[in-house]
């Protein structure tokens, strides 16, 4: 039993109202490019996060797991119907498609010359690009990217799960839009 004035979880109608208010503050288009993300549960998790943060399109390229794989669909929990997923034969082709659509391509990767994500130019229409679980973004994707950014980490682990990295990058892009707008 909760005491009067204690926080309570929102009801579904309250959540819908809250989400509508955030959607009104959202102008920029946000997309993803997945370069050979091979594990179906990672693809499904990324799709679910993408749907939650208003991503309009996901380009899948290279040896990327299919969003139709049973494990991807199970992890996505039906949200795959809310995000357009398109296949491209290569990361370079996917990056070119994103650029042709007016999106700035920002690869999330640890490289020489990469900038911290919180300093990356995330304003406007952006396509965040993430790579394979073991090898990261391909050389072709890094060459095609407008910017390469990394997620600063202070712990003793050298990398993040690709689905976690996607969630952090997407949330930072939206947070920046909402706080700068």
Give residue ranges: language-model regions.
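Post-transcriptional modification and biogenesis factors for structured RNAs
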Residues: 1-181
